[in-house]
Amino acid sequence: MTYAYRLHWVPDNASLVIRLALEEMGVAYEPVLLNRAAGAHKGAAYMRLNPAGLIPALETPDGAIFETAAILLWLADRHGKMAPAPDDPDRGALLKYLFFTSNTLHVA
């Protein structure tokens, strides 16, 4: 089976929320488990997806997306099930907490 999306992930990091969102939205994807211990995320093929070598990365027909918040927002906008639409008055609250969680809480 060919999937529109390929999620490069590891079980113990920010990839989990991406997997949960994809599952909750009912979006088919191919999970690509990375061997972080072997340095798969620093190899040339993965670095073409995410030049920082960080996990996760989502391959889409439009190119690769990285950064957890960016992936979540992109998926929500494409599949319209997990977030207020861009013209919804509640969109600002979503963005505020999405980026606070990604940039402040997750870093800690």
Predicted regions and their residues:
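GST-like domain detector, emphasizing the conserved glutathione-binding G-site
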Residues: 1-108
